[in-house]
Regions:
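Contiguous segments within soluble domain cores/interaction surfaces
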Residues: 1-5, 24-27, 64-177
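Serine/threonine-rich, repeat-prone extracellular segments and beta-strand-based repeat modules
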Residues: 1-2, 18-63, 153
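A short beta-strand segment in extracellular, disulfide-stabilized domains
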Residues: 3-15, 45, 86-88
Length: 177
């Protein structure tokens, strides 16, 4: 399971025992209440139970909290092959609130044609994005990667990237005509 940061995600759980009956059944939050989605990363939700004879059991469910990506450009607009596509984005929570910051590194990791027929290395235009890192723009309150489309064939392309502290790889797309 993966949740956007700060998404209200409620877990309902119960314990049953066909013999002596359930004595206790407890989880980290009350049944039906939201689990913690404020911190990025992998989490575990565990419910512990005991029956009236003292037998115990537990069940765990893992979930991951990740940023939502808010693209600040038209992902469906077609760009001429050989042009520069300014990929602009913000790191958002589930409500769309911006959590981008200069201290958080966004790194471009791959470029693949959506239909899977081609892949290419990530190339920026000029020297605006050293080490394939998006640059933080204070005015935008987000990130920019000036992506070179030199040599890309016609179609929809997917740019993959990682974000410091976020265990989930992310993607955005653009079209080349």
């Amino acid at each position: 399971m993966c949740f956007d940061q700060r998404r209200v995600a409620c877990r309902e759980w119960a314990s049953a025992d066909g013999g002596s009956g359930v004595a206790t059944c407890a989880g980290p939050v009350a049944n039906g209440n939201p689990v913690d989605t404020t911190m990025l990363g992998a989490h575990t939700f565990t419910v512990d139970a005991a029956d009236n004879l003292g037998h115990t059991a537990n069940q765990s469910v893992s979930y991951t909290v990740a940023y939502n990506i808010c693209a600040l450009y038209d992902q469906t607009r077609a760009h001429r092959s050989g042009s520069t596509v300014p990929i602009k984005l913000q790191l958002c929570d589930s409500a769309g609130a911006n959590h981008s910051a200069a201290a958080i590194v966004v790194n471009a990791t791959g470029l693949t044609q959506q239909d899977g027929t081609a892949s290419d290395g990530v190339e920026d235009s000029g020297d605006a994005n050293p080490d394939d890192n998006f640059r933080y723009d204070e005015e935008l309150e987000g990130y920019i990667f000036n992506l070179s489309t030199d040599g890309l064939t016609t179609g929809t392309w997917v740019l993959s990237f990682t974000v410091t502290g976020d265990p989930i790889p992310h993607t955005v797309q653009f079209d080349v005509r």
